[in-house]
Amino acid sequence: QRQMCIRDSPFFRLRDPAKGKNSVRFTTSTPSFEFEFQDPNADSPTLIFGEMSSTGETIVVYEGDADASTIVDIQFLGPAAGVKLYNTTTQTRINIDTNEIARLLGSTIRAGDRLSISSGVGDKYVRAYRDGKVYNALSALDKDSDWIFLTPGDNLITVRADTGIDNVSAIISFENLYESI
């Protein structure tokens, strides 16, 4: 009598799933600590706790040895248009038609809106979220878009927008996959 083992994926994962799952946050601006302060020298600030700085790209270090699918969550802190996501390492990109998102949501992108894009094998999707409702937003990807995967090693991931880049924050999540023990 023969027994067969059927798996949903041919890849190995770390025994402790928490150690194999990763999330990397990258935002287009990093907010700083703030409070009301009356500066006696208005021309030259005397109390600085932080600076806003552009961080629209990050290097994601992928430690697996097989290409990995990703889930990209894009948070909107306000209006934005023409949002694009690139993996420069693999020369792949996602172009988001924000006019189509506006059509699906009933108005232009605003603070609190979110997109989730999954390149999972057998689980590809684009979802838009507003006010607790979920919308199928696959139609918002243009015909030249690719699904974003990570390759072993360093992956340069960049987020851009035609307008409102300071209102875009992103997190990329992935799981380390291995082809053999």
What are these regions (language model features)?
Residues 26-181:
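Intrinsically disordered, low-complexity segments enriched in serine, threonine, and glycine
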Residues 7-9, 155:
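Generic structural signal marking isolated hydrophobic packing positions
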Residues 1-6:
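Short, small-residue-biased leader/transition segments that mark boundaries at the very start
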Residues 11-26:
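Charged, alpha-helical interface segments at or near domain boundaries
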Residues 10-13, 77-79:
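Short acidic/polar capping segments at secondary-structure boundaries
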